[in-house]
Amino acid sequence: RLFALGAVPRSTSTAFEWMMRQRGDLDCLHEPFGEAWYQGEDPLWPRYREGGTTTPGLSIESVWQDIRSRAAERPVFLKDFPHYINHIWTPEFLSHFTHAFLIRDPAKTITSMYDKWPDFDELEVGFPEQRALFDLLTALNGTPPPVIDSDDQLAAPTEMVEAFCKAVGIPFIESALTWEAGGDPSAHSWWAGGSLHA
């Protein structure tokens, strides 16, 4: 099975991903499509300039092949941003995933983005694409996918994670909500110096 959390930058999504890693029963992927969007052989991000970092052989298509191969071995959870792949949203592609969304107040998200990348482009913010994907999935499936509000998640983590697990059809593992200090989320990130997407 493939579980996809559609988020936006600076939405506490990496913390949610870290919690999902603690479960131990999922192959967790950190923004796999984002790596191709930013650093693939044909980067799609709007601030890319000739001579910037690229990775030969890395593309949205190669990432998708890798995800499917992993999912054939064990369940996969990925946290990613819908604006990285809005050009490949087809009913067939989207049908491979059990979808959920993590939202956060834009005032908090965008000010946090500005703090980390003062030169960010509006196409990197991702709110229009996140909403568009939610609406598309609702239309395709006849029912809206689960949505977690970051503020609710921070205020009542046990209740929110339990509800999330029930909604996507996985066991609730309460022990995943706590972990030893000192873990390094950047070890799972392709971004130089680790992820800035808290």
Which role fits each region the language model picked out?
Residues 3, 27-29, 98-101, 146-148:
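Hydrophobic/aromatic beta-strand patches that form the interior of the parallel beta-sheet core
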Residues 9-11, 33-36, 82-85, 106-109, ...:
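Short, solvent-exposed loop/turn segments at secondary-structure junctions
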Residues 2-4, 74-77, 144-145:
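Residue-level preference for the first positions of well-ordered beta-strands
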Residues 65-88:
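Glycine-rich phosphate-binding loop used to anchor ATP phosphates in small-molecule kinases
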Residues 94-113:
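Conserved phosphate-donor/acceptor-positioning beta-strand/loop module used by diverse small-molecule
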Residues 1-71, 177-198:
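PAPS-dependent sulfotransferase catalytic core
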Residues 108-177:
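PAPS-dependent sulfotransferase catalytic domain
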